[in-house]
Amino acid sequence: MLVVVSYDVSTKDTAGGRRLRQVAQTCVSCGQRVQNSVFECLVDNAQWTKLKLRLLQLFDPATDSLRFYYLGSNFKHRVEHHGAKATVDLRGPLLI
């Protein structure tokens, strides 16, 4: 399933900067960055449960915000992209 994760982490103190890096690194491990604080994550149920739990452990609900958009498995026709920064097909072959 495709889940879009967006976040806004307060960086008013050094702990916020650390949380921001940790949230971004966690999202990079499961998806691709499509905007500064927005990731598209193609995950199965077990991966999603683990990712969501980790993100909820990292953020501070008093100062930060996390949003999850569940697009499901039939997401091809639900996402439109225009402009720069073309995205990679997460289901396609990976060339290294």
Report the location of each language-model feature:
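C-terminal structural segments of small proteins and small subunits
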Residues: 58-96
